Amino acid sequence: MQVFWFIPTHGDSRYLGTSEGAREVGIDYLKQVAVAADTLGYEGVLIPTGRSCEDPWVVASALAAVTQKLRFLVAVRPGLMTPTLAARMAATFDRISGGRLLVNLVTGGDVAELEGDGLFLDHAARYEASSEFIRIWRDVLAASHDSGEISFKGRHLRVKGARVLYPPLQRPHPPVYFGGSSAAAHELAGEQVDTYLTWGEPPADVALKLADVRKHAERHGRTVKFGIRLHVIVRETEAAAWAAADDLISRLDDETVARAQAVFAKMDSEGQRRMAALHAGGSKRTREALEISPNLWAGVGLVRGGAGTALVGDPHQVAARIREYSELGIDTFVLSGYPHLEEAYRFAELVFPLLPLAVRNKLPGQVLSGPFGEVMATGIVPRASQS
């Protein structure tokens, strides 16, 4: 099992939908979050993409220099960059980071944003272009290890003699991640990507999506790994966790929710439609209505686009829900919490010891170079309580 954290390049706060409790998200703060994730033992971080965010490649390049083992899941955008240029960017980042790049293929579903960026393709055409894009990207990087070149002619993209002179460290290319809920997305995932990502829906719904992607992958003679994107609100007691969830949306008003939902309703995204359905387009507002599955809360999606659900509970409850998703075949968990710096520590301290993680976890055990609390009486090292 791998656990990733999130770099909040679109802002961070203690409350959703208000500037109250917000903090300045400059490079110094982003470095704090990245170094915390690296030190705590998170496998990697997702850096978001889109006009509401800082550029992910620039941010990732800055953060790679201040981290040691942390991997970076960074977006490539079909239609907004050429596949060969994106391949060169990926190869360079992989080389200068010591092989720490993961690539997130993002087709996009916000029509207004896409048109503002110069992309005027409908849903079907965007996925066709994405398929051609990632095929060229993968092939030109694979060829780069032998100083080769490729040519390709498709409906949307064409390259002739494409080359990447400096190959990535990872062979044949950095792993490709991809998320999408439409039939076209599942077909693309089964045919070309390494890890399929889903947003946090109830386990039964997630199981159906994974089964469909597996079916497409089998048809192409492939296997695909799976990941899930979730927020987390974990506290030492269940009551405290639900109080924190209520507090997160306590500054929301009807107008703010309605404005956000109006934007989401215009998107050409099956995944966003499914997220909105979980809270009935913003009409569900009570804890009972927003808890759509045990410990799975849809409150974040009232005003946040994309991943809109959170696991809420005490450490054992949250770990149990994670194991439930793991039993479906998910081995990568991309998590976040508000504010992202504090919650990176909280989740690692409370939940990491309960999960079957790789050796990156530095929290268990008692070593003087690790976390042991404040030394008492000039020489007494604190130990874990026996209660």
UniProtKB/Swiss-Prot annotation:
Name assigned to this protein: Alkanesulfonate monooxygenase
GO biological process, one term: alkanesulfonate catabolic process
HAMAP family reported in the protein's UniProt record: Alkanesulf_monooxygen
Protein's job: Catalyzes the desulfonation of aliphatic sulfonates.
Record's keyword annotation contains Transmembrane helix: no
Organism: Cupriavidus pinatubonensis (strain JMP 134 / LMG 1197)
Family named by the database record: Belongs to the SsuD family.
Highest taxon of source: Bacteria
Pfam family, one: Bac_luciferase
Enzyme Commission no: 1.14.14.5
Keyword terms, alphabetized: Flavoprotein, FMN, Monooxygenase, Oxidoreductase
Encoding gene (name): ssuD
SUPFAM superfamilies the UniProt entry points to: Bacterial luciferase-like
MF-aspect GO terms: alkanesulfonate monooxygenase activity
InterPro entries reported for this sequence: Alkanesulphonate_mOase_FMN-dep (IPR019911), Luciferase-like_dom (IPR011251), Luciferase-like_sf (IPR036661), SsuD_RutA_monooxygenase (IPR050172)
Catalysed reaction, written as an equation: an alkanesulfonate + FMNH2 + O2 = an aldehyde + FMN + sulfite + H2O + 2 H(+)
